[in-house]
A protein has these predicted regions:
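Extracytoplasmic
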Residues: 44-49, 65-68, 85, 101, ...
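Ligand-binding loop in jelly-roll beta-barrel domains
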Residues: 102-128
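Glycine- and acidic-residue-biased ligand/ion/polar-headgroup-sensing regions
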Residues: 65-85, 94
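N-terminal leader/targeting pre-sequences
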Residues: 87, 102-107, 132-135
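Extracellular/periplasmic catalytic domains that process cell-envelope and extracellular macromolecules
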Residues: 42-44, 64, 72, 89, ...
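A short, N-terminal "cap"/entry segment at the start of jelly-roll beta-barrel domains
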Residues: 2-48, 81, 97, 115, ...
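Histidine-centered metal-chelating micro-motifs
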Residues: 59-61, 79, 96-109
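Short acidic-glycine-tyrosine-enriched beta hairpin
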Residues: 54, 84-101
Length: 135
Protein backbone atom coordinates (compact mmCIF):
# COMPACT_ATOMS: atom_id res chain seq x y z
CA UNK A 1 0.00 0.00 0.00
CA UNK A 2 1.44 3.35 -0.92
CA UNK A 3 2.18 5.85 1.83
CA UNK A 4 -0.55 8.20 0.54
CA UNK A 5 -3.14 5.41 0.39
CA UNK A 6 -2.27 4.27 3.94
CA UNK A 7 -2.40 7.90 5.12
CA UNK A 8 -5.80 8.32 3.47
CA UNK A 9 -7.09 5.15 5.12
CA UNK A 10 -5.78 6.36 8.47
CA UNK A 11 -7.54 9.70 8.08
CA UNK A 12 -10.80 7.97 7.11
CA UNK A 13 -10.55 5.64 10.10
CA UNK A 14 -9.70 8.45 12.48
CA UNK A 15 -12.58 10.51 11.13
CA UNK A 16 -15.16 7.73 11.29
CA UNK A 17 -16.41 8.90 14.64
CA UNK A 18 -16.84 12.39 13.22
CA UNK A 19 -19.42 11.49 10.58
CA UNK A 20 -22.16 13.04 12.72
CA UNK A 21 -20.50 14.56 15.78
CA UNK A 22 -22.67 15.61 18.72
CA UNK A 23 -22.71 19.21 19.91
CA UNK A 24 -20.20 18.31 22.66
CA UNK A 25 -18.02 15.89 20.70
CA UNK A 26 -16.51 13.00 22.64
CA UNK A 27 -12.80 12.22 22.21
CA UNK A 28 -12.02 10.54 18.90
CA UNK A 29 -10.29 7.19 18.31
CA UNK A 30 -6.57 7.26 17.53
CA UNK A 31 -5.95 4.90 14.61
CA UNK A 32 -2.49 3.80 13.48
CA UNK A 33 -1.90 1.42 10.54
CA UNK A 34 0.42 -1.44 11.50
CA UNK A 35 0.65 -3.35 8.23
CA UNK A 36 -1.05 -3.96 4.90
CA UNK A 37 -0.63 -7.02 2.72
CA UNK A 38 -2.15 -8.01 -0.61
CA UNK A 39 -3.72 -11.45 -0.30
CA UNK A 40 -2.42 -12.94 -3.53
CA UNK A 41 -4.31 -16.22 -3.04
CA UNK A 42 -7.59 -14.30 -2.66
CA UNK A 43 -7.88 -12.12 -5.78
CA UNK A 44 -8.97 -8.55 -5.13
CA UNK A 45 -8.51 -8.76 -1.35
CA UNK A 46 -6.01 -7.27 1.07
CA UNK A 47 -5.36 -7.43 4.81
CA UNK A 48 -5.07 -4.26 6.84
CA UNK A 49 -3.97 -4.38 10.49
CA UNK A 50 -4.55 -1.30 12.64
CA UNK A 51 -4.14 -0.34 16.26
CA UNK A 52 -6.93 1.70 17.79
CA UNK A 53 -6.85 3.67 21.01
CA UNK A 54 -10.04 4.94 22.57
CA UNK A 55 -9.12 7.81 24.89
CA UNK A 56 -11.34 8.00 28.00
CA UNK A 57 -14.92 8.80 27.00
CA UNK A 58 -14.55 7.94 23.29
CA UNK A 59 -17.82 7.20 21.47
CA UNK A 60 -17.77 6.32 17.75
CA UNK A 61 -20.53 7.20 15.31
CA UNK A 62 -22.48 4.47 13.56
CA UNK A 63 -20.50 3.15 10.57
CA UNK A 64 -19.71 -0.02 8.65
CA UNK A 65 -16.78 -1.87 7.16
CA UNK A 66 -16.98 -3.55 3.76
CA UNK A 67 -14.65 -6.10 5.31
CA UNK A 68 -14.26 -8.99 7.69
CA UNK A 69 -13.01 -7.32 10.89
CA UNK A 70 -11.37 -9.23 13.74
CA UNK A 71 -10.81 -7.18 16.90
CA UNK A 72 -8.55 -8.14 19.84
CA UNK A 73 -8.54 -6.05 23.04
CA UNK A 74 -5.11 -5.22 24.48
CA UNK A 75 -5.93 -2.80 27.30
CA UNK A 76 -8.96 -1.28 29.02
CA UNK A 77 -12.63 -2.07 28.52
CA UNK A 78 -14.67 -1.36 25.39
CA UNK A 79 -18.32 -1.79 24.46
CA UNK A 80 -19.19 -2.97 20.93
CA UNK A 81 -22.30 -4.00 18.99
CA UNK A 82 -23.55 -4.47 15.45
CA UNK A 83 -27.12 -3.89 14.28
CA UNK A 84 -29.29 -6.81 15.37
CA UNK A 85 -26.64 -8.10 17.77
CA UNK A 86 -26.21 -7.86 21.51
CA UNK A 87 -24.08 -5.16 23.12
CA UNK A 88 -20.92 -6.76 24.51
CA UNK A 89 -18.35 -5.49 26.97
CA UNK A 90 -14.82 -6.61 26.15
CA UNK A 91 -11.68 -6.68 28.29
CA UNK A 92 -8.05 -7.59 27.47
CA UNK A 93 -7.74 -10.89 25.64
CA UNK A 94 -11.33 -10.87 24.36
CA UNK A 95 -12.37 -10.64 20.71
CA UNK A 96 -15.14 -9.20 18.54
CA UNK A 97 -16.12 -9.87 14.92
CA UNK A 98 -17.82 -7.71 12.32
CA UNK A 99 -18.82 -9.02 8.90
CA UNK A 100 -18.95 -7.03 5.65
CA UNK A 101 -22.73 -6.58 5.91
CA UNK A 102 -22.77 -5.55 9.58
CA UNK A 103 -23.49 -2.00 10.70
CA UNK A 104 -21.30 -1.08 13.68
CA UNK A 105 -23.83 0.62 15.97
CA UNK A 106 -21.84 0.84 19.20
CA UNK A 107 -18.12 1.40 19.67
CA UNK A 108 -17.02 3.15 22.84
CA UNK A 109 -14.63 3.18 25.74
CA UNK A 110 -16.43 1.89 28.84
CA UNK A 111 -14.29 4.20 30.99
CA UNK A 112 -14.26 7.97 31.30
CA UNK A 113 -10.89 7.87 33.09
CA UNK A 114 -8.75 5.16 31.40
CA UNK A 115 -7.82 4.59 27.74
CA UNK A 116 -8.60 1.37 25.90
CA UNK A 117 -6.46 -0.16 23.15
CA UNK A 118 -7.15 -2.87 20.62
CA UNK A 119 -5.91 -4.29 17.33
CA UNK A 120 -8.16 -4.89 14.33
CA UNK A 121 -7.33 -7.09 11.36
CA UNK A 122 -9.50 -6.32 8.33
CA UNK A 123 -9.79 -8.54 5.26
CA UNK A 124 -11.20 -6.17 2.67
CA UNK A 125 -11.52 -5.37 -1.00
CA UNK A 126 -8.42 -3.72 -2.41
CA UNK A 127 -8.92 -0.02 -2.98
CA UNK A 128 -12.02 0.27 -0.77
CA UNK A 129 -11.88 2.45 2.34
CA UNK A 130 -11.85 0.49 5.58
CA UNK A 131 -14.58 2.61 7.20
CA UNK A 132 -17.77 3.64 5.41
CA UNK A 133 -20.85 5.60 6.49
CA UNK A 134 -23.74 3.43 7.64
CA UNK A 135 -26.43 3.00 5.00
Amino acid sequence: MSYLRMLGTTLVLAGSAQLTPPAHAAPQPIVVPIMQKDLVDIPGKEMLMISVEYPPGTVESVHRHDAYAFLYVLEGTIVEAVRGGKEVTLTPGQTFYEGPNDVHTIGRNASTTKPAKFVVVLVKKKGVDAVLPAE
